[in-house]
């Protein structure tokens, strides 16, 4: 009869969806109700809400109880309930919150079970006779009248509306609350102070929008497959993978790791790629194929290009610097561009202050300050743009690897962002996406053309660059940024290699000269990412690591490996220069095992 709303997210149109599904009631936060402008204070009981003639009962869950249970002493909760009972003897007070608070969150098992909080709490509830009775939501709906009818604004719990704000606005809201929360008028004013809407996580974190847009495309594919007669196991398996990819944890960030956790993003993409592959097989696409399509795949009102075959799926954004923003390896259901940029967060000033003394008492998860590694304040670095591939840099000649790793490099061109023109060239077994832009570098007009070619049955991308209009009397420093996600650092079975020798684990900073090939192996994932070029190349590699907050504390998280081949470009007599690179994604078990064996034998 009732259901739990994930993250207590509410939009009024959900009323009809719930009612049509047979749902009679749900629990939201009292924050939702006060944001609607209700004059009832405190908020107890339940309310009716309606949409298109459909009616559902809504219970306001108490924020005060959310913070008392289980972090306050049991008697504090009893006294709070006693005060309410004295004012409203027959009212219903609702507590609804995460089960993780009772043993899963850090230190809560010891607090709730080992130190006896839960037993004390239940004993004290049982001891109260006459004035206090525990009940269910169903009984409350059946035996108590609604407080009235109310229409709620789009909302979630208070903290999530704050987390969804841009960092600057989030800080302003925190400052406002800190300034006025002890003011005598604050209880009357605070219902008019609220944050943003949860959907803006897709704006705050463009990577969340990428997952969301990809999920929506798969959702449409599942719907179309059903309309076209696909049924049975293929349809149910694809739908199951789609639903798994809709797990909300990966799409946002607050007091918990969320989108900052690579294994969550990887899991979303794994299930989306699984669904895509299942639907291809159901449609009879079992032989090598090649295809390309142009559509607004990320909901920015501009066209993106999907390039795919039986081995790989790529998404390119000509209007955003001509970047490659998704690269799916279908055999292992892995997106090598499930990256995350380094960006400011509202809690980073706390990180800058360094470690403080450990807390002795369990408090709300929202106020917990723990440093999981030393020196995190020195690891706060920010990116000017997304961490994707085919990002084109014109750099100062004295730019160093450390400059790149810190994000401190100076850009001397306008090719890393902005729109490129594009076209798709096709033949029977190969498709090339060409993108070009006439821009400037070092104040000089240049034309940059890049092409991405994929052939049927091939696990490799061929990437060609052509620079035109280069000055004959000077050289330029040109770099192409490639990022590879989901290859974790800090493990012996994930490493750089070149010509059958290891170059170090994936957190290694590499500054190599005059090379033409290098690889990255992840033995656990079962992939060898091999890069090569048709001319001698200087190459930088560095880890991309974020400092983020999770329920267990502040932590350093490896997000991706940045690979930057770079050249001091000397043009030909016509002011032209070119390079061709290959990115081979080898997941063949035989050749992969042979490569690993050769690596180990050499050591």
Task: Enumerate the predicted regions with their spans.
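Active-site and substrate-binding clefts of carbohydrate-active enzymes
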Residues: 42-56, 60-64, 75-308, 312-321, ...
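Polysaccharide-binding surfaces and accessory modules of carbohydrate-active proteins
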Residues: 459-462, 468-539
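Beta-strand-rich recognition/accessory modules
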Residues: 409-449, 456-464, 468-471, 519-603
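Phosphate/nucleotide-binding catalytic core
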Residues: 1-23, 416, 443-461, 471-482, ...
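Acidic-aromatic substrate-binding/catalytic surfaces of carbohydrate-active enzymes
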Residues: 310-423, 436
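Short, flexible loop/turn elements at secondary-structure junctions
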Residues: 4-9, 22, 29-32, 60-65, ...
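Short helix/loop capping segments that flank catalytic or ligand/cofactor-binding pockets
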Residues: 13, 35-36, 67-69, 103-105, ...
């Amino acid at each position: 009869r009732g259901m739990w709303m994930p993250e207590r997210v509410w939009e009024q149109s959900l009323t009809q969806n719930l009612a049509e599904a047979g749902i009679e009631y749900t629990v939201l936060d009292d924050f939702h109700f006060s944001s609607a402008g209700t004059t009832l204070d405190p908020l107890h009981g339940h309310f009716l809400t309606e949409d298109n003639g459909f009616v559902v009962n809504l219970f306001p869950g108490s924020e005060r109880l959310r913070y008392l249970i289980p972090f306050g002493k049991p008697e504090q909760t009893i006294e709070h309930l006693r005060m309410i009972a004295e004012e409203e003897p027959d009212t219903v007070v609702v507590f609804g919150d995460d089960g993780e608070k009772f043993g899963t969150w850090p230190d809560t098992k010891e607090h709730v079970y080992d130190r006896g909080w839960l037993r004390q709490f239940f004993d004290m509830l049982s001891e109260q006779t006459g004035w206090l009775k525990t009940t269910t939501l169903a009984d409350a709906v059946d035996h108590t009248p609604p407080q009235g009818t109310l229409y709620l604004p789009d909302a979630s719990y208070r903290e999530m509306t704050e987390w969804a704000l841009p960092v600057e606005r989030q800080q302003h809201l925190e400052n406002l609350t800190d300034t006025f929360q002890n003011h005598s008028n604050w209880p009357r004013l605070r219902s008019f102070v609220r944050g943003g809407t949860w959907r803006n996580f897709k704006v705050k974190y463009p990577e969340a929008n990428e997952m969301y847009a990809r999920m929506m495309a798969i959702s449409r594919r599942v719907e179309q497959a059903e309309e076209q007669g696909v049924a049975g196991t293929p349809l149910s398996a694809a739908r199951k993978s789609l639903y798994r990819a809709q797990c909300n944890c990966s799409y946002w960030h607050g007091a918990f790791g969320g989108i900052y956790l690579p294994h969550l993003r990887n899991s979303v993409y794994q299930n989306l790629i699984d669904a895509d592959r299942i639907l291809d097989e159901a449609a009879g696409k079992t032989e090598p194929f090649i295809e390309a399509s142009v559509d607004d795949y990320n909901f920015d009102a501009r066209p993106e290009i999907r390039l795919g075959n039986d081995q790989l799926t790529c998404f390119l954004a000509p209007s955003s610097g001509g970047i490659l923003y998704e690269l799916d390896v279908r055999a292992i259901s892995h997106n090598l561009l499930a990256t995350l940029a380094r960006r400011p967060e509202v809690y980073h000033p706390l990180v800058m202050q360094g470690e403080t003394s450990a807390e002795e008492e369990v408090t709300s998860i929202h106020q917990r300050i723990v440093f999981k590694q030393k020196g995190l304040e020195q690891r706060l670095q920010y990116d000017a743009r997304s961490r994707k591939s085919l990002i084109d840099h014109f750099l100062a000649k004295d730019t160093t690897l450390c400059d790149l790793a810190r994000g401190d490099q100076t850009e001397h061109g306008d090719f890393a962002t902005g729109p490129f023109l594009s076209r798709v060239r096709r033949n029977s077994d190969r498709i090339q996406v060409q993108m070009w832009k006439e821009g400037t570098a070092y104040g000089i007009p240049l034309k940059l053309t890049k092409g991405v070619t994929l052939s049927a049955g091939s696990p490799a991308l061929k990437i060609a660059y052509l620079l035109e209009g280069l000055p004959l009397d000077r050289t330029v420093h040109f770099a192409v940024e490639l990022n590879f996600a989901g290859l974790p650092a800090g493990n012996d079975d994930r490493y750089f290699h070149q010509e059958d020798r290891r170059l170090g684990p994936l957190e290694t900073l590499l500054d190599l000269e005059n090379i033409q090939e290098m690889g990255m192996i992840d033995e656990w994932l079962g992939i060898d990412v091999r890069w090569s070029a048709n001319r001698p190349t200087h190459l930088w590699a560095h880890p991309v690591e974020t400092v983020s907050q999770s329920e267990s504390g502040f932590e350093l998280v490896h997000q991706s490996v940045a690979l930057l081949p770079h050249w001091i470009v000397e043009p030909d007599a016509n002011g032209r220069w070119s390079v061709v690179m290959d990115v081979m994604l080898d997941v063949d078990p035989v050749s992969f095992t042979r490569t690993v064996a050769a690596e180990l034998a050499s050591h």
